[in-house]
Regions:
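Bimodal "functional hotspot" detector
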Residues: 19, 26-322
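Secretory targeting and sorting signals
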Residues: 2-28
């Protein structure tokens, strides 16, 4: 088999995989066919999600249940500028709740969240899980009737029951209805080998103020294994966000500040690197253009282009049709 023929086969496989991923971007609940949001569509800002703090005198099972129910509001702050879900936790567990960094488990909204008491002030929570979203945003559908469970310790804080999370931390449990409100599918883009085209990898991220940061962080990661040999990234290995935030100014310019390295400053990498970031970050609501800076140096220019670029065509790139 010639190299060109092998390349065509690999590219065809990528197209099939991408198409399958695009087709699987909803969580099935019935046999009805419903119109849904397309992957990569610019999603309107979500409505604010309001949840209640713990009620005085609530028993352990109610505290555990209401903590899980507070999960969809993990990006919201109350009047005291604190995330309400944290008020269900014992002080030593606040930093163990990492909804942005650990696995999100999606459970069937038609099934019950089962909570059973255990000895030594503990409760076990069990759900019928339908999918997981890992820390990189990859969605994995689970076999039917998959059960997921965890154990929370319970302790009294100022006379009220509060949760002691597992030592390895806890992410999110969201029912299917809340998942649809909080998460959306996006494309993280990579450069097709020897071409000025980008191919997407589908990820799921929370829709909210930190979406540009989540998309940028995902773009910095290595190329997924299934795209190996077909696509590459122009972003040097080991490059990170210099600050854990991608601010968006009032004109819609998202500024990405990267850690310094010789490869990051390589002029041959700038156009494809910029193309990847533009294609990925412009999916975030309000982002119209992208500027790239290097820590300690400032904006990295590309010949004949402005400091902030808004179009792939300005860079000579395009998206692979899916």
């Amino acid at each position: 088999m010639t190299g060109r023929a092998a390349y065509r086969i690999r590219l065809g496989l990528v197209a099939l995989l991408c198409g399958a991923a695009l087709a699987a971007c909803g969580i099935p609940r019935s046999s009805d066919v419903l119109d849904g949001r397309r992957v990569g569509d610019n999603v309107a800002p979500r409505a604010r999600i309001v949840v209640n703090p713990p009620a005085v005198g609530s028993p352990p099972d109610v505290i555990a249940r209401d903590f899980i129910r507070s999960g969809p509001a993990f990006q919201e702050t109350g009047d005291d500028q604190q995330v309400v879900g944290r008020s269900y936790l014992a002080p030593g567990s606040v930093d163990l709740w990492r909804p942005n960094a650990l696995t999100t488990t999606v459970y069937d909204s038609r099934t019950l969240l089962k909570i059973e008491p255990l000895p030594s002030d503990q409760v076990r929570l069990t759900i019928t899980a339908v999918a997981t979203i890992d820390e990189t945003g990859h969605y994995r559908e689970l076999p039917p009737d998959t059960k997921a469970s965890t154990v929370f310790g319970m302790t009294k804080v100022d006379g009220e029951w509060r949760i002691k999370l597992p030592d390895d931390g806890f992410g999110l449990w969201l029912n299917t209805d809340d998942f649809d409100r909080v998460f959306a599918a996006y494309q993280v883009n990579y450069v097709l080998t020897a071409k000025k085209e980008l191919v997407p990898d589908v990820r799921w991220f929370p829709v909210g103020p930190r979406l540009p940061t989540a998309l940028a962080r995902a773009q910095l990661a290595a190329v997924p294994a299934y795209l190996g040999g077909v696509a590459d990234t122009a972003i040097p290995q080991g490059t990170r966000l210099a600050v854990d935030a991608v601010p968006v100014d009032p004109t819609g310019v998202a500024t990405i500040t990267l850690t310094n390295s010789t490869q990051t400053l390589d002029p041959t990498r700038r156009r494809p690197m910029w193309a990847q970031f533009i294609a990925t970050l412009r999916q975030a609501p309000g982002v119209t253009a992208v500027a790239i800076e290097v820590q300690g140096i400032g904006k990295i220019p590309v010949s004949s282009l402005p400091a902030a670029v808004s179009s792939l065509s300005d860079l000579g790139f395009s998206l692979t049709p899916t």
